[in-house]
UniProtKB/Swiss-Prot annotation:
BP GO annotations: aerobic respiration
Ranges where the 4Fe-4S ferredoxin-type domain occurs: 42-72, 88-117
UniProt catalytic activity: a quinone + NADH + 5 H(+)(in) = a quinol + NAD(+) + 4 H(+)(out)
PANTHER family noted in UniProt: NADH DEHYDROGENASE [UBIQUINONE] IRON-SULFUR PROTEIN 8, MITOCHONDRIAL, NADH DEHYDROGENASE UBIQUINONE IRON-SULFUR PROTEIN 8, MITOCHONDRIAL
Binding-site residues for [4Fe-4S] cluster 2, renumbered to this chain: C62, C97, C100, C103
Function description: NDH-1 shuttles electrons from NADH, via FMN and iron-sulfur (Fe-S) centers, to quinones in the respiratory chain. The immediate electron acceptor for the enzyme in this species is believed to be ubiquinone. Couples the redox reaction to proton translocation (for every two electrons transferred, four hydrogen ions are translocated across the cytoplasmic membrane), and thus conserves the redox energy in a proton gradient.
Subcellular location field: Cell membrane
Membrane topology term: Peripheral membrane protein
Phylogenetic placement of the source organism: Bacteria, Bacillati, Actinomycetota, Actinomycetes, Propionibacteriales
Source species of the chain: Cutibacterium acnes (strain DSM 16379 / KPA171202)
Name of protein: NADH-quinone oxidoreductase subunit I
Amino acid sequence: MGAWSGFGITFETMFRKSFTQGYPEKGKEKPMPPRMHGRHQLNRWPDGLEKCVGCELCAWACPADAIYVEGADNTDEERYSPGERYGRVYEINYLRCILCGMCIEACPTRALTMTNDFKMADTSRAKHIWTKDELLAPLKEGMEQPPHPRRLGDDEDDYFNGLPPSGQDDVRTGPANSGATAHRDDDNDTQHKDEEAA
């Protein structure tokens, strides 16, 4: 009798309405908090060059040993970042990553940040090792795919301060040679006065 009573319970519940909820619930997903630690992103400068300089500090800071970086030197013919070096190989193993954010704190150029995207489930273990192409931020309007020369500023200081080349309008200060150039001239005058006083 025991086996037949089990079949009876199964037969009764077969036609009941299911209470299982699908995941994710379409239209009911809550927005993630802005400071949530999701997947990583390699950022770009406004002209499209990569911010990563291949210093490997993120890999050294990672407690799970999930990051692999291989740096290389930029050349005048092939420039991927504004500095001397760039990250030629950049991989994050999400099977090991604990999303702690220590790599973000270690990055000196703010090249590495974390997004709110956390849905990275997949059926293959190999797909959890994200490469540089998958981690790089998409090109926005006005950006150019590297390699290419620096498009901002006359020298490295101007580039990292976001100043345009001489003769071009600075979107922050107005017409050419008014804001940023005037500021540079003031700095030079102050420096010359200090040198004369010494």
